[in-house]
């Protein structure tokens, strides 16, 4: 049975070996976030086998780097690590809210209903454009302790998960933008090249 994000968050709060780190900016985050135009963002990823302390250390470094950039989601390929791992935290203002860690995530089902919403990305800073995605998803994954989980997500959480999972396939949100004129203008304004986009639509 798929559990909601809220249920998983409550479970995470009680779990020993938490990967949570202080939600504070760092002058020197442990990992560099790569940006559009760097080929590292387009490479395929590998599933994680054993979930051990080295994986949890990576999760902590990803969280520290995400918080330093004031982001709400980060996928391993964005920091040059080609593993199927992503972290999310939609509540940056509450120190006690645990992050969500998704290892080897797979979308089991998605709703026929779609929503259009503006997205941004730490790998394309300053660029915000509308993207169409399913409004609800159900996914399977392993948590930071290696336990198999299922989760149902909707709204912003569903969108963020889909956005970050795209990174695991070498896909960036700009690849899904349908408004060509707006895309070109936004990229140019923020110093990115239209040629680095790989349209999916």
From Swiss-Prot:
Active site, UniProt feature: 164
GO molecular function: metal ion binding; peptide deformylase activity
Matches recorded under NCBIfam families: pept_deformyl, PRK00150.1-3
InterPro entries hit by this protein: Peptide_deformylase, Peptide_deformylase_sf
SUPFAM superfamilies: Peptide deformylase (SSF56420)
Domain of life, source organism: Bacteria
Entry EC no(s): 3.5.1.88
Keyword presence, Flavoprotein: no
Keywords of the record: Hydrolase, Iron, Metal-binding, Protein biosynthesis
Comment on bound cofactor: Binds 1 Fe(2+) ion.
UniProt keyword Protein biosynthesis present: yes
Stated name of the protein: Peptide deformylase 2
Pfam family, one: Pep_deformylase
Catalytic activity, as annotated: N-terminal N-formyl-L-methionyl-[peptide] + H2O = N-terminal L-methionyl-[peptide] + formate
Enzyme's top EC category: hydrolase
Single GO biological process annotation from the record: co-translational protein modification
Annotated function: Removes the formyl group from the N-terminal Met of newly synthesized proteins. Requires at least a dipeptide for an efficient rate of reaction. N-terminal L-methionine is a prerequisite for activity but the enzyme has broad specificity at other positions.
Family: Belongs to the polypeptide deformylase family.
């Amino acid at each position: 049975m798929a559990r909601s994000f809220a249920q998983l968050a409550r479970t995470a709060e009680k779990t020993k070996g938490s990967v949570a780190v202080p939600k504070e900016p760092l002058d020197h985050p442990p990992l560099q976030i790569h940006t559009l135009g760097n080929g590292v963002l387009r490479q395929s990823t590998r599933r994680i086998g054993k979930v051990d302390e080295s994986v949890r250390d990576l999760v902590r470094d990803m969280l520290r780097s995400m918080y330093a950039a004031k982001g709400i989601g980060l996928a391993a390929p964005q920091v040059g690590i080609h593993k199927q791992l992503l972290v999310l935290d939609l509540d940056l203002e509450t120190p006690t809210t645990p992050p969500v860690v998704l290892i080897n995530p797979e979308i089991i089902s998605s709703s026929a209903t779609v929503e259009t919403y503006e997205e941004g990305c730490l790998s394309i800073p300053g660029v915000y454009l509308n993207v169409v995605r399913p409004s609800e998803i159900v996914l399977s994954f392993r948590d930071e302790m290696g336990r198999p989980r299922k989760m149902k997500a909707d709204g912003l959480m569903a969108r963020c998960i889909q956005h970050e999972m795209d990174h695991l396939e070498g896909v960036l949100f700009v690849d899904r933008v349908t408004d060509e004129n707006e895309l070109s203008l936004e990229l140019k304004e923020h110093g990115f090249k239209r040629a680095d986009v790989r349209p999916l639509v």
